[in-house]
């Protein structure tokens, strides 16, 4: 797996420490750090509730990421930190572009969360492909039946 991860850190010294913890964790599942968010497969915003307008900065940044990835594959978007912990469900409802929300107490689970998300995404793609193929087969059968019916 040649995946790249970018983490933008807002706020306090603790968040800088947590960002390094996250980088150390995701290395174990094949992610490499990048300084260029546009080449990332995984984009994490590590947030801080103490700083002014932290929540709005998150939504502003997500807007920037959406714009950058409009014509290429969307990265896995994760909101981490204390804003994520406090606003978990609200963030997911307000911004569907967010894939995962993880608070500081769950950083030890971040690899499992990422791998579970990727597995579910793979299954969903496979189901969509199967539905498309089944629909395509049914359309071909219908066309063949209509041709047969005209004789």
Residue positions per predicted region:
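Proteins enriched for Cys/Gly/acidic motifs involved in redox and nucleic-acid/cofactor modification
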Residues: 1-151
């Amino acid at each position: 797996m040649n995946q790249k991860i970018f983490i933008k850190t807002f706020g306090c010294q603790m968040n800088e420490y947590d960002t390094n913890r996250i980088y150390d964790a995701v290395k174990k599942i094949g992610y490499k750090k990048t300084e260029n968010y546009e080449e990332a497969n995984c984009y994490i915003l590590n947030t801080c509730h103490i700083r002014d307008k932290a929540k709005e900065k998150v939504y502003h940044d997500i807007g920037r990421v959406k714009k950058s990835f409009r014509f290429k594959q969307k990265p896995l978007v994760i909101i981490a930190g204390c804003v994520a912990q406090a606003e978990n469900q609200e963030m997911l409802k307000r911004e569907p572009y967010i894939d995962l929300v993880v608070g500081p107490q769950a950083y030890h689970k971040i690899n499992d969360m990422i791998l579970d998300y990727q597995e579910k995404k793979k299954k969903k793609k496979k189901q969509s492909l199967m539905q498309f193929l089944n629909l395509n087969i049914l359309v071909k059968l219908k066309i063949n039946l209509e041709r047969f019916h005209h004789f």
